[in-house]
Amino acid sequence: MTGVQTCALPISLELDVDGYRIRDDESFDQHDFLRRVKESVKGPKSSCPSPEEYMQAFEGEADHVYVVTLSGKLSGSYNSAVLAVNLYNEEHEDCGKQIYVFNSRSASIGETLIGMKVQEFEESGLSFDEVVKQTEEYISSMNTFFVLETLDTLRKAGRLSNLKAFVASTLNIKPVMGSTDEGSIQQLGQARGIKRALAKMVEDVVAATKDCEHRILAISHCNCPERAQYVKACLEKLARFKKIVIVDTAGISSMYANDGGIIIAV
């Protein structure tokens, strides 16, 4: 189908480190953020976009609008976006604009992969309903995995007891984490030392992906490009993917992954 144009319009979340507010947009300074997090006692917090911010983004010439949010189990972004769609439709009953909100049930690079699929389907000439249907099927087939260098952020966010975090840190135990079908976080396993944990994660990724040669795999790293390249090399030894891409984490992803964290979505 010719003449179809698509564009991505990021809607920023806001991060807060001990009262210092940071927008998760192109101005995000990862190194400064990680320094502030390391020095913080309480740890970072985040706030999702308001319905009004989403509604402002809906304005424009596009007849088809697709929103991809953080997992509804991890953030209020999905509920805020759904509310925004309902409010917008009430105020613009006859505008002819079709809007759909995808709950990524993932985070970080997982959202990016979903956005890429939406663009692929839309530019292929599929109808709005068919784009939604096929993208939802893609989301259901996706998996997200991650390994953290430190448990500090999870501890400060109340996800771990101080004792569990202390024991894991003392024994150099690194958990291998992943997403559930609903988009929550679960522990898949653990290993002593970061390299063993990364190797375990790679094995889990390959075991969970039945059609590797047809899928794009994405690696997102927080300030550790060499580690990301190591993971890529390990994956290529075990399976052949359609493509493997590596990107650095942005704001909210840097908050959850913390310095040295690795996230995989496929």
Question: What are these regions, as identified by a protein language model?
Answer:
Residues 36, 90-94:
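Short, conserved catalytic or adaptor-binding loops enriched in Gly and charged residues
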Residues 8-53:
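N-terminal glycine-rich anion-binding loop in soluble enzyme alpha/beta folds
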Residues 8-16, 20, 64, 74-77, ...:
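Mixed-charge interfacial surface used for oligomerization/domain docking
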Residues 50-59, 84-87:
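Short, charged beta->alpha transition segments
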Residues 1-7:
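Single conserved hydrophobic/aromatic residue that forms the stacking wall/gate
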Residues 71:
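Short, glycine/charge-rich beta-strand/loop segments that flank catalytic centers
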